[in-house]
Every structure is written in C-alpha cells, then in structure tokens.
Design a protein with these regions (language model features):
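Conserved catalytic motifs of ABC-family nucleotide-binding domains
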Residues: 174
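Walker A (P-loop) phosphate-binding loop of ABC-type ATPase nucleotide-binding domains
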Residues: 61-65
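Conserved ABC transporter NBD signature motif
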Residues: 82-96
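Catalytic Walker B motif of ABC-type/P-loop ATPase nucleotide-binding domains
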Residues: 178-182
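Conserved ABC ATPase "signature" region
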Residues: 120, 124, 132-149
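ABC transporter nucleotide-binding domain
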Residues: 194-284
Length: 327
C-alpha cells in the first residue's frame, strides 16, 4: 500500500500536488433484501486517498465494487460503514457536487435534444450564463469531434457518439474532480486514444481524475496510481511502476545483430546464469498503434466518413490556468 504523506500540501516525487482531494476510510456497502438481510457485500472495508492532479484508476472485473464505490463518492449511495471526504467535505454537500464532473457507465441523455441543446441543458443546471454555455458548448463539441453533428438529435447517435457527448457534459462546469466510469466503452480506437489524451491533459492542468475501468490498457496508459478490486476488497494499490516491475528480470533492446554476434552474446549470458530462461524475439507494434496508423493514412487521403470526426485540442476554458476554484 502507498503511505499517505503527512503534509497534505507537500509535493510528490512526480511533481504533482500531494493535497488530498478524496479521502476514503473503512468504506463498506452491503446491499440488503426486503427483510433487511445482507444480500451482497459490494464494497468491503476500503481505504485510499486521491491527490490533486492525479489520475487514479479503479481497476477490477465486472461486479468487483468499482461502480458502487464511484456512486458513494458522488453521494448517490449511502455507505453502510466508513467515511468519505471530497474536498474536505461530505460528497453530498451541494458545493462539493458543483466541483465534480461525472460520466456514468451508461450516459443518461434526452434523445430528442441535439448535441448543442444537450450541453446547454446541463450548463443551465450549473447556473452558467447563456454566453458561457454557448462558448463552452462550441469548444467541447469541437474537442470531442461532434461539431459536424449539430442538427442531429442524441437519439440518432451511435453508442460511441453518445459517449462523446456524455464526456462533454461531464466537463461543462469546468470541474476540479472528474469521475469517469468506463469512459471508452463503445468508442472506436481513435476515440479511445483521444479520451486518454484528454485525461492526461486534464491532469496536467491540475484537475483530479478518477477512472473506473475493467480495461487494462485504459488504466495502464493514463493512470498515476491504481487500486485493484476483487470481491469488493482492495487486492493491490500503488503506482504502475511499483505494481508492474519485475526486479528479477532484465530486458535488453538492440538493433538487429549479426547471427555470429547474437551467438556470442547468448553464450556469455548462458554461461553466467546457468539454467535460467533466455528468450530472444522481435518487438511488435501493438494493435492500437497499428490501427491508428492505418486510419491516419486514410484521413490524409481525404477519405470521407459520416460518423464522429477526430476530436480537436482541449477546450480553451479547460486549458486556461492551473488553479482550482475555491470550495
């Protein structure tokens, strides 16, 4: 487990603020049946902290307690036991909720509104004035690649396009804490890569991101620290380097070597390690990188598509400044 720093304002080794944004202690959630008998222990005695500017991953298989934890962080569910603080307050506090952006696992959208009307509706819930709503909607729709679909209603969108508009609504209030539950579900590899890049950009701006996912690649690509759930319990927590390092294994990468040179190197290694395993192979490109390369070539050839476009840079109002708003 990673120890929490004694000074809440200190800087971590990676340069990120150690100010604690989310504090969870002894968090437990037991769902009961009609008669009040325990039916399922979804979350069981969980402890963790999330720091300002950190991308914190909740990783685990389906049904491991990730989404239940997220709902308690949002104040949508009461814990059976334990304590949660978000920005030093209860997650049910109105001022706390105003500083949070949330993308649920299934986006709840009004199917007869178009994308601009959808963002205007959610912006109005945060009491943004009309000019701010219009400006932010324009920037967000460009950012998520939906600025060419303004006249289409959300009900006509594919699932991937609905995820994009869902992400835009989660950012309409310029939140200090962004909670994303399976943000890449239904997205094509291009959209997945853009979402990951956006998450990194938000963290660089000083925002805190909690990412709940069962997809290993999502978590591995963007998270500073990860907690792994199974059976409602934390099985492991730490930085990716701490969790993934294999101190008893060494990898050496070289250009292609002549066969004679390779044989000499292998002979030296085998003489040194005895019966230990030695493996020689050629590195391969991962499928995501190859797919993106193919699509990029098609885009450069000016091939047309009627779906979502590639997203643009991070919305201007999300990039300006690094200071979070006061509570």
């Amino acid at each position: 487990m990673i120890a929490t720093e004694s000074n809440p304002k200190a800087q971590t080794a990676g340069g990120k603020s150690a100010e604690v944004v989310v504090s969870v202690r002894g968090l437990t959630k037991v769902f009961k049946d009609f008669w009040g008998r325990a039916k399922a222990r979804a979350v069981d005695d969980v402890d963790f902290d999330v720091k300002r500017g950190e991308v914190f991953g909740l990783l685990g298989p389906n049904g491991s307690g990730k989404s239940t934890t997220v709902k308690m962080l949002l104040g949508l569910l009461y814990p059976t036991k334990g304590h949660i603080e978000v920005f030093g307050q209860s997650p049910r506090h109105v001022q706390t909720k105003a500083r949070i952006g949330y993308l649920p696992e299934e986006s709840y959208l009004y199917r007869y509104l178009n994308s601009r009307e959808t963002l205007d509706f959610f912006g109005n819930l945060f009491h943004l004035d009309k000019n701010d709503r219009e400006k932010r909607a324009e920037q967000l729709l460009e950012m998520v690649g939906l600025n060419q679909t303004l006249t289409r209603t959300v009900g006509e969108f594919s699932k991937g396009m609905q995820r994009r508009i869902g992400l835009a609504q989660a950012l309409i209030n310029d939140p200090d804490l962004v909670i994303l539950d399976e943000p890449t579900a239904g997205l094509d590899p291009i959209g997945c890569r853009e979402i990951k890049d956006l998450i990194i950009a938000l963290a660089e701006r000083g925002k805190t991101v909690i990412l709940s996912s069962h997809l290993l690649s999502d978590v591995e690509d963007v998270c500073d620290r990860v907690v792994i759930y199974y059976g409602g319990k934390i099985q492991a927590i730490g930085t990716l380097r701490e969790l993934l390092s294999k101190p008893d294994t060494l990898r050496i990468t070289t250009p292609v070597l002549p066969r004679e040179t390779m044989e000499r190197v292998l002979e030296i290694i085998r003489n040194d390690i005895g019966n230990g395993e030695v493996r020689v192979d050629n590195p391969t490109q991962n499928l995501e990188s190859y797919f993106l390369e193919v699509v990029e070539k098609a885009k450069k050839a000016a091939q047309q598509t009627s779906g979502a476009q590639s997203g643009a840079r991070v919305a201007e109002y999300l990039r300006a400044g690094v200071e979070t708003k006061p509570a």
